[in-house]
Amino acid sequence: VRSAFIAREHGARVVNVAEKGYGSALIGGIKAAQGKYIIMGDCDMSYDFSDIGGFVQKLREGYGLVMGNRFGGIERGAMSFSHRYIGVPLLSLAGRIRYHTFVTDFHCGIRGFDREKALALGLSCSGMEFATEIIGKFARSGEKIAQIPVKLRRDGRNGRSHLRSIPDGWRHLRFIITNSCEKK
């Protein structure tokens, strides 16, 4: 609710989506968007959106999906030890094996993609596992995927994170194993 208020205050068109969840919000935004490319990113000030030129350049070169890669550019205190050295690397390894892709940071919160190509994938995960679903479906479709380095800064928001490490990690792993979303 606060993110939507702040976005409106800065001139963004905010799309209201009835179903709760990270994936639901993004799918609703993708459907409502009007541009050729979509750059999505966490709104907690942990990413520098002035750096999106690299994403757009790769998309213009014909890549369907462009992933950010936080590793090598993580500010001190921006990611917990367990996420940096256990959760993200292990889930990304499982995703690389399952989807035969080189993406090393499956959970980077900033990425770009071709809107029409994304719509054609039939994305349906309502929760955090959407982050894995979109990579898996782009990889399986044969679309070209690029990865570019990004910096991760400390979270700048005042509120608490919506991330629930164990349940969300399980949902990602479950999607990788079964290739289907958990339905509520």
Short names for language-model regions:
Residues 17, 41-43, 148-150:
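Cofactor-binding loops of NAD(P)H-dependent oxidoreductases
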Residues 101-102, 123-126, 135-153:
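Catalytic donor-sugar/metal-binding loop of nucleotide-sugar-dependent glycosyltransferases
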Residues 3, 29, 44, 114, ...:
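Residue-level signature of catalytic and energy-coupling elements of molecular machines
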Residues 2-6, 41-58:
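Acidic donor-binding/catalytic loop of UDP-sugar-dependent glycosyltransferases
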Residues 1-16:
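Acidic donor-binding segment of Leloir-type glycosyltransferases
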Residues 180-184:
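A charged, well-structured terminal subsegment
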Residues 7, 59, 138-140:
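Hydrophobic residues within well-ordered alpha-helices
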Residues 17-32, 37, 49-128, 154-177:
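Acceptor/aglycone-binding surface of glycosyltransferases and processive sugar-polymer synthases
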